[in-house]
Amino acid sequence: MRRLLFRGLAFEAPPGTLVRLAGANGTGKTSLLRLLTGLMVPDAGEILYKGESITKLREDFHRDLVYIGHMNGVKDDLSARENVRIAARLGNLIVTDSQINEALGAVGLTDFTEHTTGELSQGQRRRVALARLFVSEMKPVWILDEPFTALDVQSVANLSDAVARHVRAGGIVIYTTHQECAVDVPEEKKLTVDVSAFAPKRKKKAQACLGGGDHV
């Protein structure tokens, strides 16, 4: 059975904005991320990017987007290094071995670059997925579902730094997290959207309502 997730939900994230989606489990944070990526389509409202609906700019928008969801999207029969390289190629990025090594090192996988991901723990597989961010800093929009989960203290710090650099360089980062992770960007560049505040007050035919600004 479909259910109404949001009513009257709208926010704007201009370049250089860090958006945290807050709310209890089951309030629709992951669904909202999928809507923002175009993987789901709202029954009403729209998501705008550069002033146009992402349904009209699908190819350009996806070229500018890095999305890391709950599913890691890694291939078990490929090494950690090969997974990062292929993900980069799919994103039209050319990366060197040294860049891949640096990316895997940033998430604590220096000693596992040649291991197939099928040999790795679930937490390590998550880190392989997150290593993509460290070779995708030129992609303007990052949408991340619980990116800090399963990381050690140093990897959390490295990822926080990467997110901060991206925002300070004019990128947009939209993410969910249950962890308190300090991201060093000016307060005026931060936006928290509590999705539970837009939950419907009563049950109706399901629809997802989103409004957008000139960007995401």
Model-derived features with residue positions:
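Conserved ABC ATPase "signature" region
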Residues: 85, 97-112
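Conserved ABC ATPase signature
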Residues: 77, 116-121
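Q-loop/switch helix immediately C-terminal to the Walker
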Residues: 71, 76-92
